[in-house]
C-alpha cells in the first residue's frame, strides 16, 4: 500500500471525533466499550485510517482486558513499535506502519505461540468480515 500522509485537517474530516482522538492523538477508549472487544466474527481487522490489513480474527482471543486482543499481527511489517513513557509507565505503543495511526500497546503476557498480547482500541480498527465457503469453513 505505501505510506499515507495526510494533514490533521484531512484526518479530522475523514474520522469521527472519537476515532481521531484515539488514532491521531494517541487516546484510549474505556475498557469493555469498543465495538470489537467481544466480537466473534471471522475476518480481517484493518486500520480504520488507511485500510491496511493488520490482524486476522484467527489470532484474536479473550484476554479479559476489555479491548480486542491478538497474539500476532498478520505479518511483522504492518505494525511499528515505539517506546511509550506516558502515564508513569514504560509500555510499547503499536502504530500502523502505513499511516502511523495509534492502535494500542503490545504486552508480553499473551498466550502461546507468541506470548504477546496486542491490545488494540476498537476505534482504530474496522472488521472486514468473512463468510463461510461451500464446505462450511472459513477460507
Curated annotation (Swiss-Prot):
Catalysed reactions, as listed in the record: L-methionyl-[protein] + [thioredoxin]-disulfide + H2O = L-methionyl-(R)-S-oxide-[protein] + [thioredoxin]-dithiol
Essential cofactor(s): Zn(2+)
Active site per UniProt: 119
GO biological process, one term: response to oxidative stress
GO molecular function: peptide-methionine (R)-S-oxide reductase activity; zinc ion binding
Binding site for Zn(2+): 47, 50, 96, 99
UniProt entry tagged with the keyword Zinc: yes
Gene3D superfamilies per the UniProt record, alphabetical: Peptide methionine sulfoxide reductase
InterPro entries: Met_Sox_Rdtase_MsrB (IPR028427), Met_Sox_Rdtase_MsrB_dom (IPR002579), Mss4-like_sf (IPR011057)
Domain named MsrB: residues: 8-130
EC category: oxidoreductase
PROSITE patterns attached to this UniProt entry: MSRB
Coiled-coil region: none
EC annotation from Swiss-Prot or TrEMBL: 1.8.4.12
Cofactor binding notes: Binds 1 zinc ion per subunit. The zinc ion is important for the structural integrity of the protein.
Annotated Gene Ontology cellular component terms: cytoplasm
Pfam families according to UniProt: SelR
Keyword tags: Metal-binding, Oxidoreductase, Zinc
Family affiliation: Belongs to the MsrB Met sulfoxide reductase family.
Alphabetical list of PANTHER family matching this protein: METHIONINE SULFOXIDE REDUCTASE, METHIONINE-R-SULFOXIDE REDUCTASE B1
Protein name, entry field: Peptide methionine sulfoxide reductase MsrB
